[in-house]
């Protein structure tokens, strides 16, 4: 107590009384504004809630919510089950696979009580805490599966919004989410995601929660979660499912509440090497399945952000177009550029009459001076007629690469059939 008083006195001496009070008021106002935004994005009005409950779907879309349990705190479990019971979409089942130990028999009691009241809740007590999610999937009867962790909560419209996308042909759906502590009003972070991007997913698992997918995507898989990817099983699962999905849809709404507490993954920010290794293995396996080969690396200093050094299929001629060069010594610029460029063979088309003192047997220099009436686009369009390269790089004469493998870095993406244009940071 004495040390606390000393700290307060020291703070008052340093800042006075007014500044801390003003800062506290500003923080309270900011929190109120943030809460308004949160409510705007994730709460629904009574009329909308009623409309969702009364909407009739032509298709019989049954969603099985899969939840593995292990020593789940009583209040967390009740909140989870109630969040599913409160769904505005009613064609669901909740599959609870319980691997809790004997000291947590209350988990079984609570689940059985709810299951007796609502037949849509299916509970199984497992003989051991292993493969709970996989086992729950085996007895699920829905054509679509949603994944809900045992200490989290669903937004009341979560299944309705997913069912709407399923009706429109989606077979893999993911939503935005919000981290919270004891109640959803006590939020700590809102996670608004981008739409599906293969390359972003290969760099980190940004999809996370809430995920609903068609059961047919599991065809040919022995299990959803693989033991060999323990530590990054969710990441491996998302990679495998999205490979097979035909229509992936992102719902830009907060439909999942991810609880933050002392024992949760959301609170544990430490990097575990086995999890990093498992993630790299999951990405490598994904590349093998898609026949896109490369080396997976950690994008240091961030160990859980990954980058792929794709193998080059071959070494085609790359044409580099240089324009807007304000230097009189274009030859000096090209010489410096070549020293900073490891890749060969190259073809350089430049806006000049001649280039001197550039000798490299694997580099062809083509001079194509720009007319005064031509803009850059017109010049490049005409210059292309002189090139023989399979790939084309347009480079301002004011730019210089910072790494010698800059062409390889761009080429390894450009060679992919699903990529048309590649750009770098300047």
Protein language model regions, located:
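Short aromatic/hydrophobic "clamp" motif used to bind/position activated sugar donors
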Residues: 145, 392
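Conserved donor NDP-sugar-binding/catalytic core segment of glycosyltransferases
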Residues: 157-188, 399-426
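Glycine-rich, basic loop-to-helix element that forms the pyrophosphate-binding segment
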Residues: 125-140, 370-387
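Hydrophobic/aromatic residue at the end of a short beta strand that borders the catalytic acidic motif
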Residues: 148, 153-158, 179, 233, ...
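N-proximal low-complexity "stem/linker" segments adjacent to membrane-targeting elements
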Residues: 22-83, 292-336
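Conserved nucleotide-sugar donor-binding catalytic segment
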Residues: 197-284
């Amino acid at each position: 107590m004495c040390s606390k008083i000393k700290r307060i006195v020291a703070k008052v001496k340093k800042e006075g009384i007014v500044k801390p009070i003003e800062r506290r008021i500003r923080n309270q106002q900011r929190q109120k504004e943030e809460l308004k935004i949160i409510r705007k994005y994730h709460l629904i009005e009574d009329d909308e809630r009623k409309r969702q409950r009364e909407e009739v779907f032509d298709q019989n879309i049954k969603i099985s919510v899969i939840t593995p349990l292990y020593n789940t705190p009583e209040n967390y479990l009740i909140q989870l089950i109630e969040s599913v019971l409160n769904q505005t979409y009613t064609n669901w089942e909740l599959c609870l696979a319980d691997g809790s130990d004997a000291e947590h028999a209350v988990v079984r009691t609570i689940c059985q009580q709810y299951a007796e009241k609502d037949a849509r809740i299916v509970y199984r007590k497992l003989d051991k805490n292993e493969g709970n999610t996989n086992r729950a999937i085996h007895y699920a009867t829905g054509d679509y599966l949603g994944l809900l962790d045992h200490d989290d909560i669903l937004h009341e419209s979560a299944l309705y919004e997913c069912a709407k996308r399923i009706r429109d042909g989606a077979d893999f759906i993911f939503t935005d989410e919000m981290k919270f502590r004891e109640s959803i009003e006590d939020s700590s972070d809102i996670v608004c995601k981008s739409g599906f991007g293969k390359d972003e997913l290969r760099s980190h698992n940004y999809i996370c929660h809430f995920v609903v997918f068609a059961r047919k995507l599991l065809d040919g898989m022995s299990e959803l979660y693989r033991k060999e990817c323990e530590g990054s099983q969710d990441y491996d699962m998302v990679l495998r499912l999205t490979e097979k999905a035909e229509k992936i849809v992102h719902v830009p709404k907060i439909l999942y509440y991810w609880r933050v507490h002392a024992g949760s993954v959301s609170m544990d920010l430490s990097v575990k090497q086995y999890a990093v290794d498992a993630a790299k293995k999951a990405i490598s396996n994904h590349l093998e399945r898609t026949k896109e080969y490369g080396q997976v690396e950690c994008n240091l200093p961030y160990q859980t952000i990954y980058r792929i050094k794709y193998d080059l299929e071959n070494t085609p001629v790359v044409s580099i177009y240089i324009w807007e060069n304000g230097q009189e010594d274009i030859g000096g610029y090209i010489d410096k550029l070549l020293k900073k460029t490891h890749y060969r063979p190259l073809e350089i088309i430049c806006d000049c009459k001649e280039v001197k003192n550039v000798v490299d047997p694997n580099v062809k220099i083509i001079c194509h001076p720009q007319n005064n009436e031509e803009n850059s686009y017109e010049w490049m369009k005409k210059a292309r007629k002189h090139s023989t390269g399979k790939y084309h790089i347009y480079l301002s004469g004011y730019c210089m690469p910072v790494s010698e493998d800059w062409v390889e870095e761009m080429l390894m993406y450009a060679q992919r059939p699903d990529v048309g244009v590649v750009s770098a940071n300047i």
